[in-house]
């Protein structure tokens, strides 16, 4: 009987460690590492990757903004662009004709120039041009499918203005296109003075009389824009009574211009655009 109790105590000693043994026995290294893992070691790599958290980030959008128009309203020479075609340059001379003389000239032009409203053609549809025009020069001039017949009978005041511009700019001209904007509803749409008869880099001298109107320019877009003018450079030039504007260099090749309609009432305005027309486009300067 004593032997059975002794064997039971011995067997119990193997089954349950004493408190002192439990306190001093170090934990198994393998079990410590296992308890620190995120999951059982037998899980596949694919299952462990599914437990990862991914943070979604919005893609950064490239926002294109149309550039603000450049305003030119002071006397000076301005190079507005440089391209393989060349330098595009405008020269602004406010007060080229003083106010008193400009008033007299405006009165003479409104009265004596043979103004006429011509029919334009756009996409095979004819429409009355929203302005009056007249042509002076020994050669005809064709633009926008409209042909202006030769008119060598220059008014003395027009010949005097042509000579004055030539003396002050060192440019020469043999023709003149006159535009009469009767009110704020008259305008001219986007275009370039790039007809073959003018040569590749024509010089255009624009002299204004009467109400101030805004002369707007926009650069022609590169080929990758597919004719979209949304993001091109733009220029605005207020043309006052007696102001002279010269466009030269690659301006007609690289830029378009217009005089838009106005929202507010405008008094009459006359614009004289002097240019050189060549009888044979093959002989025009390139």
From Swiss-Prot:
Protein name (record): Alpha-ketoglutarate-dependent dioxygenase alkB homolog 3
Chain positions with (4R)-5-oxoleucine modification: 177
Metal-binding found in the keyword field: yes
Needed cofactors: Fe(2+)
GO molecular function terms listed in the Swiss-Prot or TrEMBL record: 2-oxoglutarate-dependent dioxygenase activity; broad specificity oxidative DNA demethylase activity; cytosine C-5 DNA demethylase activity; ferrous iron binding; mRNA N1-methyladenosine dioxygenase activity; oxidative RNA demethylase activity
Disruption phenotype: No visible phenotype.
Residues reported in the UniProt entry to bind 2-oxoglutarate: 179-181, 269-275
Positions where (4R)-5-hydroxyleucine occurs in the chain: 177
Function: Dioxygenase that mediates demethylation of DNA and RNA containing 1-methyladenosine (m1A). Repairs alkylated DNA containing 1-methyladenosine (m1A) and 3-methylcytosine (m3C) by oxidative demethylation. Has a strong preference for single-stranded DNA. Able to process alkylated m3C within double-stranded regions via its interaction with ASCC3, which promotes DNA unwinding to generate single-stranded substrate needed for ALKBH3. Can repair exocyclic 3,N4-ethenocytosine adducs in single-stranded DNA. Also acts on RNA.
Subunit structure: Interacts with the ASCC complex composed of ASCC1, ASCC2 and ASCC3. Interacts directly with ASCC3, and is thereby recruited to the ASCC complex. Interacts with OTUD4; the interaction is direct. Interacts with USP7 and USP9X.
Chain residues that bind Fe cation: 191, 193, 257
InterPro entries from the UniProt entry: AlkB-like, AlkB-like_sf, ALKBH3, Oxoglu/Fe-dep_dioxygenase_dom
Single biological process term from Gene Ontology: cell population proliferation
Mod. after translation: Ubiquitinated; undergoes 'Lys-48'-linked polyubiquitination. OTUD4 promotes USP7 and USP9X-dependent deubiquitination of 'Lys-48'-polyubiquitinated ALKBH3 promoting the repair of alkylated DNA lesions.
Subcellular location: Nucleus; Cytoplasm
Family to which the UniProt record says this protein belongs: Belongs to the alkB family.
Enzyme class: oxidoreductase
Major place of residence: nucleus
EC number, UniProt record: 1.14.11.33, 1.14.11.54
Entry binding sites for substrate: 115, 141-143, 194
Catalytic reactions of this protein: an N(1)-methyladenosine in mRNA + 2-oxoglutarate + O2 = an adenosine in mRNA + formaldehyde + succinate + CO2; a methylated nucleobase within DNA + 2-oxoglutarate + O2 = a nucleobase within DNA + formaldehyde + succinate + CO2; an N(1)-methyl-2'-deoxyadenosine in single-stranded DNA + 2-oxoglutarate + O2 = a 2'-deoxyadenosine in single-stranded DNA + formaldehyde + succinate + CO2 + H(+); an N(3)-methyl-2'-deoxycytidine in single-stranded DNA + 2-oxoglutarate + O2 = a 2'-deoxycytidine in single-stranded DNA + formaldehyde + succinate + CO2 + H(+)
Keyword field: Cytoplasm, Dioxygenase, DNA damage, DNA repair, Hydroxylation, Iron, Metal-binding, Nucleus, Oxidation, Oxidoreductase, Ubl conjugation
């Amino acid at each position: 009987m004593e032997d059975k109790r002794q064997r039971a105590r011995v067997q119990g000693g193997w089954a349950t460690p004493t408190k002192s043994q439990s306190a001093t026995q170090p934990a198994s290294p393998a079990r410590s590492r296992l308890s620190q893992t995120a999951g059982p070691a037998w899980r596949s790599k694919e299952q462990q990757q599914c437990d990862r958290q991914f943070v979604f980030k919005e893609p950064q959008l490239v926002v294109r903004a149309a550039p603000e128009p450049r305003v030119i309203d002071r006397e000076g020479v301005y190079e507005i662009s440089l391209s393989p075609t060349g330098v595009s340059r405008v020269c602004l001379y406010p007060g080229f004709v003083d106010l008193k003389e400009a008033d007299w000239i405006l009165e003479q032009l409104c009265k004596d120039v043979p103004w006429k409203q011509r029919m334009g053609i756009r996409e095979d549809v004819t429409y009355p041009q929203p302005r009056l025009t007249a042509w002076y020069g020994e050669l005809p001039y064709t633009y926008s499918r409209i042909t202006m017949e030769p008119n060598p009978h220059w008014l003395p005041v027009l010949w005097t203005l042509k000579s004055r511009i030539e003396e002050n700019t060192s440019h020469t001209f043999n023709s003149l296109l006159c535009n009469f904007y009767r009110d704020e509803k008259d305008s001219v749409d986007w275009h370039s003075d790039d007809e073959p008869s003018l040569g590749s880099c024509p010089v255009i001298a624009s002299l204004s009389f009467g109400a101030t109107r805004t002369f707007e320019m926009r650069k022609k877009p590169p080929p990758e824009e597919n004719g979209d003018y949304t993001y091109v450079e733009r220029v605005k030039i207020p043309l006052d009574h007696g102001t002279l504007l010269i466009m030269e260099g690659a301006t007609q090749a690289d830029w378009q211009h217009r005089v838009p309609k106005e929202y507010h009432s405008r008094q009459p305005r006359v614009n004289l655009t002097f240019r050189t027309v060549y009888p044979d486009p093959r002989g025009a300067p390139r």
